Amino acid sequence: MLSEEGYQNLFRQLDAWLFEHKRLWDVQAFHSLELPWLETDPELCQWLSCHEGIPSSDQVEAALLRFLPSFAPMQWNWKDLTQPDVLVEPSSHFKAGIKGRKWSQIEAFSRSIQPTSEVVEWCAGKGHLGKLIAFQHQCAVHSLEWQASLCEAGQAEASKRQISQRFSHTDVLKGEGKSALCDARSAVALHACGDLHSTLIEQAIEASVQYLAISPCCYHLTKSSNYRPLSLAAQAACTHLSQDNLKLAVKEVVTAGAREQRLKDVELAYRLGFDALQRHALQQDSYLTVPSCGKALLNDGFAAFVDWASQQKNLSFKLSSEALQEFESIGYQRVVQVQKVECVMQYFRRSLELWLVLDRALRLEETGYQTLITMFCDKAITPRNILITANLRA
């Protein structure tokens, strides 16, 4: 287990490394018609342009080592969390109505923590995690959720199974969870987004909660336009993060099916084709953001997408079918370029995520907690598999 000093040293090394290579990950992949590193790293761009297909992370690392003389990769020595010797396995009907991958996340999270009563389940939804914790760890659980209908459904299920779990209809962002934390010894949050998990950290510190287990998610879901660090170490860091950087930290899709991935590729091609069209027609060289669209629109073809996107931006283009085909083709060509840019950015994704996780761990360390950062499951179950556990020092 790393000490606070150990986490601080790791954070400083990581911060310096990310700052040194910021030009490689702090870019807008689809805003430029050219590779964004033509001036700074022409050999890397030449390699990307000539590479057949999308490079793997290992291939990107090899290219960075080859073309950037000062580059050295960061190495992480992740610990495998030791599982408790005995946990009571729930009956199969316990997971009824919960999708397989979600249930696997809940099981893995519960196996990886050691809470004591009373446990606050933060942003509980229907309280599936809380039910398993109450059952396996023999703890009383207080589940906080802002949607009343989910509270009602969760309470009905807990009563049916005679689980020691109660629900409160609570808006934690308005401070309504403070009293529950003051009465609790433990608090848990599985994939609470952005401001939700950072609010838990701050309010748990204030309430002197003895034990915390948090798997952070969606750091970009915050009111702030730029990232506001939690710890003193991150506040003094060289690396400053925008909303786009925060999105990159969690931009890893390992669960998309073939159909879902195909639709994403088609939508990206249509958006990039429309972008090329509007740049040409309006004689300007900047990306034009278009709102999200319904997936059904993609089945109607590129011409229908252009009509829809034009209406969204109050534009009108008169184009022949040949011209539309040309811009659609450009869109698909640009998809390959964007994917190559993103593969370089993705190489730094996990490091950005760890920077954010360390910020949270250091905030807890600075306020009297002993923290541990681990992975609670394989990334095939969920890419957001990092767990922060914290015990308040005596």
What are the language-model segments listed below?
Residues 117-125:
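Conserved class I S-adenosyl-L-methionine
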Residues 126-138:
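Conserved SAM-binding loop of SAM-dependent methyltransferases across substrates and taxa
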Residues 175-183:
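Short amphipathic alpha-helix with an adjacent loop that forms part of the alpha/beta core around
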Residues 162-172:
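Conserved SAM-binding strand-loop segment of SAM-dependent methyltransferases
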Residues 1-36, 183-394:
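Class I S-adenosyl-L-methionine
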Residues 154-155:
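Conserved SAM-binding loop
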Residues 140-145:
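Conserved SAM-binding motif I beta-strand of class I
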Residues 32-112:
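Conserved Class I S-adenosyl-L-methionine-dependent methyltransferase catalytic core
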